Design a protein with these regions (language model features):
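Conserved catalytic submotifs in the C-terminal HATPase_c
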Residues: 6-9, 28, 33-43
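Short alpha-helical Gxxx[C/S/T] motif in the catalytic ATP-binding
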Residues: 121, 125
Length: 155
């Protein structure tokens, strides 16, 4: 069922580049400035690869939908102690304070969103990350919004 996780060890840096490439490089008409801030070496994690792909898919597509025309979309991976911190930042309008906590619920959709959709994407992200007891969140930053999570690294 939905609760089965099948962890495997893999390089998260290469994995992110592959997933992001599939989602972002193939959009020649895309009007944004894609930036990466990634380690120059492999960083291994032990997690369910297909679930993590769903997480990245949803977070990256969400950022792509909300980035201002010509704005920055930035993917970052930072190592700290035994953790790898992922974030995706998009320049764009802030999320109203009262909506920040609601954004992870099943049918939340920003009424200002230009896109129709089920609103399930972020709920799926929350479910998968919670199942693995990973810390995740969203915050307004100067000029935009960042979604983030942290995952333990393995040797």
């Amino acid at each position: 069922g939905a609760t089965q996780l099948h962890p495997e060890r893999f390089d998260f840096v290469e994995f992110l580049e592959t997933v992001a490439g599939r989602l972002l490089i193939d959009t020649p008409d895309a009007d944004f400035d894609l930036q990466y801030e990634l380690p120059e070496h492999p960083v291994y994690v032990n997690t369910d690869k297909s679930r993590m792909e769903q997480v990245l898919d949803n977070l990256i597509v969400n950022a792509k939908r909300n980035v201002n025309p010509g704005g920055v979309l930035k993917l970052s991976l930072k190592e700290s102690e035994d953790m790898l911190d992922f974030s995706v930042f998009n320049q764009g309008p802030p999320i109203p304070q009262e909506n920040l906590s609601k954004i992870w619920t099943k049918f939340y959709r920003d009424k200002n969103s230009k896109y129709s959709g089920s609103g399930l994407g972020l709920a799926i992200v929350a479910q998968i990350l919670s199942m693995q007891h990973l810390i995740y969140g969203v915050e307004n930053q100067p000029g935009g919004v960042a979604f983030y999570f942290s995952i333990p690294t393995v040797k």
